[in-house]
Design a protein with these regions (language model features):
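A detector for small-residue-rich transmembrane helices and their helix-helix packing motifs
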Residues: 1-205
């Protein structure tokens, strides 16, 4: 069987971990007290809000607000992450995923601080947007189908278009429940890391 049709270990285990935690939280902690208190990322001046902890830069990536949020992120991770893990290697792929996720949170915190806004953050979207960026950079001319478009587009144009859309939505303030700048941040940190690795001749594209 072609290995590219199989799911490599890091992608598989990330999907399992996210899904298991999603189900466990709804069975054990249905009103999300534990998650809100300890696992999602808090950045706020509200003295009554849960405290910020540095480990939340990791744990927030494994929480999702609903099934649609979880499914969208895990489907994109599975679709694009498999190829990248085979090409980067499992250890480097995991490093890339985590760097994008942490970097996404840092960018969103920076924007929230500049605007004087309180922030709570959860979800793997920042890391997944980094995965999308990497696929577009390393396979720019691959044709992909994007719902609801009736025709395929090149991966590079999908990534550019998505980045522009996220920036526009972030600045417009539309759909304020979505961390648009975290999505952009995941892409930026991902691009920086890919360029650094290429400079070090650890990857080629």
């Amino acid at each position: 069987m072609n290995p590219y049709f199989q799911t490599p270990p890091v992608v598989k285990n990330l999907i399992i971990a996210n899904c298991v935690l999603f189900m466990a939280i709804r069975l054990i902690d249905p009103i999300n007290h534990f998650c809100a208190e300890y696992m999602q990322l808090w950045w706020t001046n509200n003295p009554f809000a849960p405290a910020f902890h540095s480990y939340q830069f990791i744990t927030y990536m494994f929480l999702h607000g609903g099934f649609g949020h979880l499914f969208g992120n895990m489907f994109a991770l599975w679709m694009f992450g498999r190829t990248l893990e085979y090409e980067l290697g499992s250890q480097r792929f995991l490093t890339y995923y985590l760097v994008c996720g942490v970097g996404a949170a840092l960018i969103q915190i920076g924007v929230a601080s500049l605007l004087g806004e309180n922030l709570t953050l959860l979800g793997a979207s920042g890391a997944v947007f980094g995965i999308l960026l990497a696929f577009g950079v390393m396979h720019p001319n691959n044709m992909i189908y994007v719902f609801p478009l009736p025709f395929p587009i090149k991966a590079k144009w999908f990534v550019v278009g998505y980045a522009v859309l996220e920036i526009a939505l972030g600045w417009s303030g539309v759909n304020t429940g979505v961390a648009h700048f975290a999505h952009v941040g995941g892409m930026l940190w991902g691009l920086a890391l890919l360029l650094w690795w290429r400079k070090q001749r650890k990857i080629f594209f």
